[in-house]
């Protein structure tokens, strides 16, 4: 997937738009050879590892680490989507379209379960 923005075009730490962030992650992965040397399965395994770190941060009440964990999982998923020539935005839109009218119930412990 070709980078839409050069990493140097955006100041570090400034709030970027969704599209800028996707392009920056894409360019970062491209410049480090991830698209050429890795594969979708490896990116999913990395995402699972990052999800474990996110869960660990949540359990320990480490808010900054949890935010970083969410970002790390998203980076892996953006790269995964890039390898599949998918738009992560389209994937999210597809998922929302599927759940938006979903009915279900809340289980004890706060998990929403869809109706059959």
Regions found by a protein language model. Name each.
Residues 2-70, 74-116:
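Flexible "arm" and connector segments at domain edges
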């Amino acid at each position: 997937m070709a980078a839409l923005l050069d990493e140097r075009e955006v100041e570090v730490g400034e709030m970027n738009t969704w599209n800028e962030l996707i392009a920056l992650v894409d360019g970062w992965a491209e410049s480090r050879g991830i698209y050429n040397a890795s594969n979708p399965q490896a990116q999913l395994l990395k995402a699972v590892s990052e999800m474990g770190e996110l869960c660990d941060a949540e359990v320990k009440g480490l808010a900054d680490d949890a935010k970083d964990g969410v970002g790390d999982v998203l980076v892996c998923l953006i790269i995964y989507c890039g390898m599949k020539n998918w738009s992560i935005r389209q994937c999210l839109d597809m998922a929302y379209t599927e759940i938006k009218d979903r009915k279900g119930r809340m289980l004890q412990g706060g998990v929403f379960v869809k109706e059959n």
